[in-house]
Structures are given as structure tokens and as C-alpha cells.
Swiss-Prot record:
Gene3D superfamilies: 6.10.190.10, Aconitase, domain 3, Aconitase, domain 4. One of its GO terms (molecular function) is translation repressor activity. InterPro entries: AcnA_IRP_Swivel, Acnase/IPM_dHydase_lsu_aba_1/3, Acoase/IPM_deHydtase_lsu_aba, Aconitase/3IPM_dehydase_swvl, Aconitase/IRP2, Aconitase_4Fe-4S_BS, Aconitase_4Fe-4S_dom, AconitaseA/IPMdHydase_ssu_swvl. This is Iron-responsive element-binding protein 2.
Length: 963
């Protein structure tokens, strides 16, 4: 399917830029006059795209007029949007490209031309989520050799041998593991449960590795472990038009999107238009800080955009956020982010655009803005937009942007009134205006279980103690008063330490949110420098790591001279990509694990990301806090979160003098000076060279050269999915859901991590059994995220999260009841039995079903389990779109009702029918086997969603377009 022809209806608006016939644009302000002038900047971008793509079919003149009349039409109409480009990361990119490959097969089978199946817009796929930390500071973990790759071919790692003497770890006293093999035996059990039949030298290390080699070794293993996936990506870049793959080791999707792919203004042939983007990564919103409209959507919707269809959204309300005042000296952009997050959550901006204006905006750098914009999914907004202004232009100039293009960009943006100027006499009109005084924001962290639970650093000690007292919940651990002062001794690396409630055991500056912000990274480095120089250290049992977003972070930390000091404190670079943040953390030492279990301690992880859903880091780490990078370092030095930084010292110097946090906290002037000297130009130049040159391993990787992908039936990574098995040229009539059983009875805030985990594959899981039956050992399982190209693994991994709370079971476990037999089984095993019996399934849930990361397998998995509908109190929008996009009906209880109020136990049998004529918000009647009947709302927002559902989902709908 070709993309729509531009401007059929509004060709008369095309003008040349300053008389240059090679630079044309749609002069949209002429269309609306004063109506245009009061539009928020973000809505002006939507309007330009509508005008440019108006062909009377996919984009109608009525849609354009609705956007122009935003003031009266907001929240009341659906509008299409054609983004300029698409960005994928590999965790969600691989199922998207596998679906494309499978669609080619289906189109050919039904007599169509498979060559027509390719993206209609530029699509960039960044391989950034496959990194796992096999090699850390002091040694090499025995890395897996999965069925999909050969580690010896990938990196020719030297054989691992048992040694009878202590391994010479760099720094000796700062080794992160107990490396005295004399105290351990092969059968002692002091090694990771994910590593079998390997020499036991220390809990998670084997060979000593110099720091620079650590990154290379992790990359070697990454290429070996993911060889099949990488070959498939390389085939995709050659087989499909408009697909470019950014290879491993380059950086994260949102990082590369911001620093390399972003154009601000597109110049296609002779036409100028605003850059805009959608992608399968929730952090895609980061680019809004650069004045580029963009947000995260599901993999299924992204595929539709790639095939030339628009994204459809309700014309959003736009909340104007006026920033005033100046930030305090000790406040980082992360504190500003968390302050805005809490404020916007309280105001309520779900499903809305947020647009920033006011005098305070000009005081924020681009990296500050992108950090704020990156967090918008956490407060529920679709996006948070910072219009282009002089700060943006200066940033682009410093990053080496071509000056001629920069001049054209400025002229174009001013011509179409997309350039924000503090001297403007009037601001756009907004649906609502809120004010935030930057001076009122104080340093804070977020936790212990949810990112929205913000805690001022000054209140941290009292808040943690309150959490110990509270009943088990989002802010409670219910530790008996007489147990709260308990300590447990742990012997580590020849020394004795005490663990207690609040002890920090994981401290990670990870590759999410913060690494794009040089100021906070440099602040962490400066803090480390001052700490080391004054004699402070991190206790060796704390699992510390530094996982940068891209190579330029390493560059500026190194060139500024702070990297060695971070290393001295244990924050060594372990690789480039998502690791700790997606559950790929290396295990803690056995000594620490035993101590935690012995004392039933509430130990803590402190990380500089933006997500910390329960159980994500490590099962034994019950409290997890989000903090700015310098605070991560500070809490690591303190060794506990149960501390008042204002009144209690971090430690003592060599003379015994007490050292407080304010003694080593870097000033904003120090940070900004270092940022200017070591960051701006070189970091972007480095990434550009890295992306364009690739790397030796990627460049030498062989891939098939064919229109159709040659599926390997033995592959455990890439498999042709079954979504198109029953595809016909015409859709069948909607079928009723009759005599359905409830597969799971869930509560509130069920996340996509609960539904479709991205981390490691547990040995006892259904997915593990599948892989074992195909000859793989536990060391070769890899992660669910890495195996999203295999529908058999992902279906078995659906609802396999150990933290899943199913009310049928009464405790966290990936289990359910198969009611016909009364057996308690793994969720997959129960669903498999139901399918053999021909019994359809539904899911009962509470509020905010499907919250968290955008993850299309959280819909695909239940679909392949046989789930026909989900009945919940409310949904996360992206996940609801996914359910419709795969053919699952999203049903909602009537306002004020839920399963409890209706007296449902979940053990009933449910039946409902769909009328031939569906419409948005239609009420349906459900009958149960007990005789009880009740009404629910079919949560379809528009006719497009209804059409997709009738086709059996978006994939079937799109595939039929090629026939």
C-alpha cells in the first residue's frame, strides 16, 4: 500500500520559502487566520500533517476542519495523523518485522504480491534491548550459548577454568564478588540459579576483566546470543524499503532518536514539513523536548503506520503548563521531572497533550526538556511538548547541525508560526492552564514500589520507617516493630558487614531517562570525584553498575575526567543498552541473598531510571527507589536509604571528620561548565560516525537475500506466527462469545510486565519446558524480550510473571484454576486445556488494566491463549488499542460497578453477543450460568476500531488491503 498523495484538497496553500522554488511548504496559517493563531503549537503540527496528507479518503477535509476548530471539537472527534517517520526498538521491533514477514507469506498464499508489503514511511529499528550484563566489573560470568548463536564464533572467548587461588580482581578490595575459591566448592550452591554446570569461583564472576574489555565482552556475547535475531534484522533492512537498522552497541532507541534521527524539519524532495514520529517505545516522547511531535504507540498500530495508514486519536485536550521562577541550586532536572509528574498526576492529564510555556521554559536546556518530556507516560499524558525556540536552535548549532539547513528551518518554522518566542504578546489558548514555580521544587526520589510515589529527600528516612510500619501495599511492608532494628551479619571479601532494613544492595545508573541528560550524569561523576578524593567508598557487596544510553556518555564522562572516580566507587560501564531497567540484572552474591532471607530484610535498590515495578530488579529486593544519578551514587556511599542527609553523615574522611552530602554535592556552575567543555559537540559527532560506520561484527554478519524470509523450523528465536492461519479474503461475521470461562481474576494496576514479562525465563515456566524440549539448557534460554519473534515462547510466557496476583489462587503466582477439572495449573497449561475443550476465555480485571510499558505481546499472548474479551473497570489506552488491534474485545463495567459489586466470583460461565451494527460506546448484555445478567460497555472509541475488530484485528485488516 502506497502512502497517500499529499495535498489534493489544499494544494492552493503551497508556497515557496523566500522565493526559493526548491523549498516549498504548505502555508497552513492562511487556512485559519485567527483560529490558527490561538491553536496550541502541538495542534498546529497535527493540522499541518492533515493538510499535507488530505486525499479525501484516509484524510478527509472534514478531519482538517475538525483540527482547525480544535477549541470546540477537542475530546469530541477522532482525527487521523500521518507521522513523518517510525522508530522501533528490537524488543517490539522484532515482532513487528516478523509480522511483516508473515504477512508477505499470507499475501502470497492468497494470490497477492508480497513485494507490496513494505513500510510506506522511513522506519528506523534500533537494536538496543538485547544487552544483558554477563561481564561486570571484576570478572566474566559464564555466558549462555543459545540455540540461536555460537559464542565461540562470535567472540572466541577463552575457556573458563577453575583456579585454586584468589582471582586478581582490579582494585582487590573493591571486588563485587567473593572470589576466594578456597571457601567454595562446586556443590556449594553459591552461584546464580541461571548458571549451571560451571566452575564456582564467586557468586556471579569467573574471569577478571579490565574495564574497557568488559564492554567488548558483553557485546561479543550479545552478538553470539542474538545471532538469529540480528540476521533477521539485517534481512529486513535489505528486503523492505525504507527500513534502516541501527546495530547493537550504538545506543538506545529513544537516545538515538533524539541525537541522530531527529530532523526537527523534514525536507523531502522540495517540500518542507515538521518532523514527527511514533514508535514502539514509550520513551519516544523524549523528542517533544526538541519540538518534535511524537509519542509511543503499540507495535500493531506502528505496523499500520508503516503500511501507509494513519494513527487515529481523539482530538486531544491540551493542558498548558506555565513554568515560572528558577530552579534551586541543588535540584536536578530529575527533581523537576518528578515534581511535574506528581503535579500533573494530581491535576489529571491522562489522554491529553501537555504543552509548556512561560518564562521558566527558557531557563531549561534541551536536555532538561527532553528529560521532562520523556517522563510524560508516567503521568498519563500522550505527550509533553516544548515548541522550538532560540534554546532549541542554539542546541542544534552546538551539535553540529548544518548552518544552511538551520537557517531554512528557522525561516520555515517562523513562516508557519511554529516558533515560540518569549516576546510574543499572547500565548495560545489551552484547554486548561496550570502553573508550576520551579523554585518550589525540592530534591526527591520516588518509591518504594511505584514511580508516582514521590518522596522528598529530606523526608526519606521518616517515609521509609513509615513504610516498614504500614500494611503490605504500594507504600507498606508491615514489618513488626520489634523486628525493624534487626541486623544480619554478612561476611564479604574477607570483611564483616551489617545488613538491615533499608540497606542498599543494588545501585544502578541505568540506560533509561537520565543518560541523555549530561548535567545529571556529570553531576554524578563530580560527586564521585569529590567522594573519592575525600576518602569515601561504596561497600563491596552492593551491586553497582553504569549502563550508558550510548557511547557518547562514555566519551564525555571520560573526557571530563570523572569516569575513573565512578569506577573507584564500583560504577563501571557494563554495556550500552537496556539492562537493569528491563530486568536483565546480574544476581546478588549468595552471602547477601542468605543474609536478606535470614533476616527477612527489606533491602533496597536505587536506580536512575523511570520505572521500578515490583519484582523487576530482583525478587529479594523489596524496596526500589528512582533517583537522579548523583543521588544514586550518594545512597550507594551511604549504604542505606534509612538516612537523613541533612543531619547524618555519609561517612568520615581519613582524619575521622564526618562528611555530609552537602560537602561533596557539585554546584550547578561546576556542572554547566563541564557540560559546555566536554559534551555538546563531540557527543553528537561521535554518535553520527558510529551509526553511519556500523561495527565490524554487524558489517560482517551474513543475512538471506530473498523476498520471503526462509523460516528455520529448528529456530527458537524466529518463527512464523499463527496470526494469519485463518485469514480469508473477506472478514467473517462477528461471532458471539458463548459459555466462556474466566482464565484469570485480576485486581487493579495489572501492568504489561505482569501480562508479558520482558526479563529472564524461569526454569519452571511453560516457556522453559518448551525450550528444554528443543534441546536448550537454562543458560541458553535468554529473555522473553529476546524471544518475541517466537510466538510459541511468548504465548507460554504470557501471565508468567511471579508477581501476578490471581484472586483464584490468593497469592502471587503465575497459576490459575482449570474449572472443568478443578486443577491448579500454570496459566498456559490451563489455557491449552480450555482450547482443546473448545471453551472460549475471558479475563476479569480492575482499574488500569495494561498499565506500564507499551507491549503488543501483552495483547497477542492472551489472544493466542484463546482469550476473546477482557472485562475491566478501566484500561491503559495503548493496551486497549492493542487488544482491539489483535481482535480481543475490551469491555468495561458500567461506572460505579465492578466484579465485587455485581457479586461475581469468576467461577461463572459467561455469554454475550455482538449486534451486527456496532457503534462506539455500545452497551452489551452479559448472561452468566448462575442466571445473573448485567450490562457492560464495549470500549470502542470510533468506527475505525470497530472495523478493525470486525476484521479480527489490525493485521488481518491490513493484509486484506494487499489482496
Amino acid at each position: 500500500m502506497d502512502s497517500p498523495s499529499a495535498g489534493y484538497t489544499f494544494e492552493y496553500l503551497i508556497e515557496t520559502l523566500n522565493g526559493n522554488s526548491q523549498k516549498k511548504f504548505f502555508n497552513v496559517p492562511k487556512l485559519g487566520g485567527t483560529k490558527y493563531d490561538i491553536l496550541p503549537y502541538s495542534i498546529r503540527v497535527l493540522l499541518e500533517a492533515a493538510v499535507r496528507n488530505c486525499d479525501g479518503f484516509l484524510m478527509k477535509k472534514e478531519d482538517v476542519m475538525n483540527i482547525l476548530d480544535w477549541k470546540t471539537k477537542q475530546s469530541n472527534v477522532e482525527v487521523p495523523f500521518f507521522p513523518a517517520r517510525v522508530v522501533l526498538q528490537d524488543f517490539t521491533g522484532i515482532p513487528a518485522m516478523v509480522d511483516f514477514a508473515a504477512m508477505r507469506e499470507a499475501v502470497k498464499t492468497l494470490g497477492g504480491d508480497p513485494k507490496k508489503v513494505h513500510p510506506a514511511c522511513p522506519t528506523d529499528l534500533t537494536v538496543d534491548h538485547s544487552l544483558q550484563i554477563d561481564f561486570s566489573k571484576c570478572a566474566i560470568q559464564n555466558a549462555p550459548n543459545p540455540g540461536g548463536g555460537d559464542l565461540q564464533k562470535a567472540g572466541k572467548l577463552s575457556p573458563l577454568k577453575v583456579q585454586s587461588k584468589k582471582l586478581p580482581c582490579r582494585g582487590q578490595t573493591t571486588c563485587r564478588g567473593s572470589c576466594d575459591s578456597g571457601e567454595l566448592s562446586r556443590n556449594s550452591g553459591t552461584f546464580s540459579s541461571q548458571i549451571e554446570n560451571t566452575p564456582v569461583l564467586c557468586p556471579f564472576h569467573l574471569q577478571p576483566v579490565p574495564e574497557p574489555e568488559t564492554v567488548l565482552k558483553n557485546q561479543e556475547v550479545e552478538f553470539g546470543r542474538n545471532r538469529e535475531r540480528l540476521q533477521f534484522f539485517k534481512w529486513s533492512s535489505g528486503a523492505f524499503k525504507n527500513v534502516a537498522v541501527i546495530p547493537p552497541g550504538t545506543g538506545m532507541a529513544h537516545q538515538v532518536n533524539l541525537e541522530y534521527l531527529s530532523r526537527v524539519v523534514f525536507e523531502e524532495t522540495d517540500l518542507l514539513f515538521p518532523d514527527s514520529v511514533v514508535g514502539t517505545d514509550s520513551h519516544i516522547t523524549m523528542v517533544n523536548g526538541l519540538g518534535i511531535l511524537g509519542w509511543g504507540v503499540g507495535g500493531i498500530e506502528t505496523e499500520a503506520v508503516m503500511l501507509g495508514l494513519p494513527v487515529t486519536l481523539t482530538l486531544p485536550e491540551v493542558v498548558g503548563c506555565e513554568l515560572t521562577g528558577s530552579s534551586n541550586a541543588f535540584v536536578t532536572s530529575i527533581d523537576i521531572v518528578l515534581g511535574i509528574t506528581k503535579h500533573l498526576r494530581q491535576v489529571g492529564v491522562a489522554g491529553k497533550f501537555v504543552e509548556f510555556f512561560g518564562s521558566g521554559v527558557s531557563q531549561l536546556s534541551i536536555v532538561d526538556r527532553t528529560t521532562i518530556a520523556n517522563m510524560c507516560p508516567e503521568y498519563g499524558a500522550i505527550l509533553s511538548f516544548f515548541p522550538v525556540d532560540n534554546v532549541t536552535l542554539r542546541h542544534l548549532e552546538h551539535t553540529g547541525f548544518d548552518k544552511t539547513k538551520l537557517e531554512s528551518m528557522e525561516k520555515y518554522l517562523k513562516a508557519v508560526k511554529l516558533f515560540r518566542n518569549d516576546e510574543n504578546s499572547s500565548e495560545p489558548e489551552y484547554s486548561q492552564v496550570i502553573q508550576i514555580n520551579l523554585n518550589s521544587i525540592v530534591a526527591s526520589v520516588s518509591g518504594p514500589k511505584r514511580p508516582q510515589d514521590r518522596v522528598a529527600v529530606t523526608d526519606m528516612k521518616s517515609d521509609f520507617q513509615a513504610c516498614l510500619n504500614e500494611k503490605v501495599g504500594f507504600k507498606g511492608f508491615q514489618v513488626a516493630a520489634e523486628k525493624q532494628s534487626d541486623t544480619v551479619s554478612v561476611r564479604y571479601d574477607g570483611s564483616e558487614y551489617k545488613l538491615s532494613h533499608g540497606s542498599v544492595v543494588i545501585a544502578a545508573v541505568i540506560s533509561c531517562t537520565n543518560n541523555c541528560n549530561p548535567s545529571v550524569m556529570l553531576a554524578a561523576g563530580l560527586l564521585a570525584k569529590k567522594a573519592v578524593e575525600i576518602g569515601l567508598r561504596v561497600k563491596p557487596y552492593i551491586r553497582t553498575s553504569l549502563s550508558p544510553g550510548s557511547g557518547m556518555v562514555t566519551h564525555y564522562l571520560s573526557s571530563s575526567g570523572v569516569l575513573p572516580y565512578l569506577s573507584k566507587l564500583g560504577f563501571d560501564i557494563v554495556g550500552y543498552g537496556c539492562s537493569t531497567c528491563v530486568g536483565n540484572t546480574a544476581p546478588l552474591s549468595e552471602a547477601v541473598l542468605n543474609a536478606v532471607k535470614q533476616g527477612d530484610l527489606v533491602t533496597c535498590g536505587v536506580l536512575s531510571g523511570n520505572k521500578h515495578f515490583e519484582g523487576r530488579l530482583c525478587d529479594c529486593v523489596r524496596a526500589n527507589y528512582l533517583a537522579s544519578p548523583p543521588l544514586v551514587v550518594a545512597y550507594a556511599i551511604a549504604g542505606t536509604v534509612n538516612i537523613d542527609f541533612q543531619t547524618e553523615p555519609l561517612g568520615t574522611d581519613s582524619t575521622g571528620k564526618e562528611i555530609y552530602l552537602h560537602d561533596i554535592w557539585p554546584s550547578r556552575e561546576e556542572v554547566h561548565q563541564m557540560e559546555e567543555e566536554h559534551v555538546i559537540l563531540s557527543m553528537f559527532k561521535t554518535l553520527k560516525e558510529k551509526v553511519e560506520m556500523g561495527n565490524k561484527r554487524w558489517n560482517s554478519l551474513e543475512a538471506p537475500d530473498s523476498v520471503l524470509f526462509p523460516w528455520d523450523v529448528k529456530s527458537t528465536y524466529i518463527r512464523c506466527p499463527s496470526f494469519f492461519d485463518k485469514l480469508t479474503k473477506e472478514p467473517a461475521a462477528s461471532q458471539p462469545i458463548e459459555n466462556a470461562h474466566v482464565l484469570l481474576y485480576l485486581g487493579d494496576s495489572v501492568t504489561t510486565d505482569h501480562i508479558s514479562p520482558a526479563g529472564s525465563i524461569a526454569r519452571s515456566s511453560a516457556a522453559a519446558k518448551y525450550l528444554t524440549n528443543r534441546g536448550l539448557t537454562p543458560r541458553e534460554f535468554n529473555s522473553y524480550g529476546a524471544r518475541r519473534g517466537n510466538d510459541a515462547v511468548m504465548t507460554r510466557g504470557t501471565f508468567a510473571n511471579i508477581k501476578l496476583f490471581n484472586k483464584f489462587i490468593g497469592k502471587p503466582a503465575p497459576k490459575t484454576i482449570h474449572f472443568p477439572s478443578g486443577q491448579t495449573l500454570d496459566v498456559f497449561e490451563a489455557a491449552e486445556l480450555y482450547q482443546k475443550e473448545g471453551i472460549p476465555l475471558i479475563i476479569l480485571a480492575g482499574k488500569k488494566y495494561g498499565s506500564g510499558n507499551s507491549r503488543d505481546w501483552a495483547a497477542k499472548g492472551p489472544y493466542l491463549l484463546g482469550v476473546k474479551a477482557v472485562l475491566a473497570e478501566s484500561y491503559e489506552k495503548i493496551h486497549k488499542d492493542h487488544l482491539i488491534g489483535i481482535g480481543i474485545a475490551p469491555l468495561e463495567f458500567l461506572p460505579g460497578e465492578n466484579a465485587d459489586s455485581l457479586g461475581l466470583s469468576g467461577r461463572e460461565v459467561f455469554s454475550l453477543s455482538f449486534p451486527e451494527e456496532l457503534f462506539p460506546g455500545i452497551t452489551l448484555n452479559i448472561k452468566t450460568s448462575t442466571g445473573k445478567e448485567f450490562s457492560v460497555i464495549a470500549s470502542f472509541a470510533n468506527d475505525v476500531e470497530i472495523t478493525l475488530y470486525k476484521h479480527g484485528g489490525l493485521l488481518n485488516f491490513v493484509a486484506r488491503k494487499f489482496l
